[in-house]
């Protein structure tokens, strides 16, 4: 996960950290925080970070993106057969057009609008849930 800015809300940061630790125990997971700024400078920093991950499948979080069920997300990630995946979360004003153009898919968590901190916590939870679905963990209930 590449995200803009540091989390200021301690409760959300703690939840995100908990899911990050769980994901790290399941395999290779990294949360990269980039400095915030205007959308274009954030976009430049994101593209620089992505240059190091040219083999990854890129999901950009954007309100115009497609929503997925948790099961569908788990299936999609499983179908990548171990290929690295990067989820990009922009700052308070979203992602630059250049970042969206670089993405393999635009992904929306919901038609609702969330703060970027809530969105970060939600994507960490959904990634953990996707792993739980694939491993048959009791965390996910149908």
Task: Name these PLM-found stretches.
Residues 1, 59, 90, 123:
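Conserved RecA-like P-loop NTPase ATPase core
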Residues 1-23:
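N-terminal beta1-alpha1 ligand-phosphate binding loop
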Residues 7, 63-66, 91-94:
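Short glycine-rich anion-binding loops that position phosphate/pyrophosphate groups of nucleotides
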Residues 13-20, 43, 97-100:
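Short, surface-exposed alpha-helical segments at coil->helix boundaries
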Residues 19, 76-80, 102:
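Catalytic-core regions built around general acid/base machinery
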Residues 27-85:
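S-adenosyl-L-methionine/SAH cofactor-binding core of RNA-modifying enzymes
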Residues 80-98:
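Ser/Thr/Gly-rich flexible loops in soluble cytosolic domains mediating phosphotransfer, phosphorylation
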Residues 97-141:
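Structured adenosyl-cofactor binding patch, chiefly the S-adenosyl-L-methionine
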């Amino acid at each position: 996960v590449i995200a803009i800015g540091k989390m200021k809300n301690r409760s959300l940061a703690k939840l995100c950290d908990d899911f990050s630790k769980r994901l790290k125990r399941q395999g290779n997971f990294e949360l990269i925080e980039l400095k915030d700024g205007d959308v274009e400078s954030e976009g430049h920093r994101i593209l620089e970070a992505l240059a190091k991950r040219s083999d990854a499948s890129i999901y950009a979080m954007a309100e115009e993106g497609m929503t997925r069920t948790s099961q569908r997300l788990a299936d999609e990630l499983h179908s990548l057969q171990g290929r690295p995946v990067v989820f990009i979360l922009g700052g308070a004003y979203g992602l630059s057009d250049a970042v969206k153009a670089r993405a393999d898919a635009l992904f929306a968590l919901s038609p609702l609008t969330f703060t970027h901190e809530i969105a970060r916590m939600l994507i960490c939870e959904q990634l953990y849930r996707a792993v739980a679905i694939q491993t048959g963990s009791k965390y996910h209930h149908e």
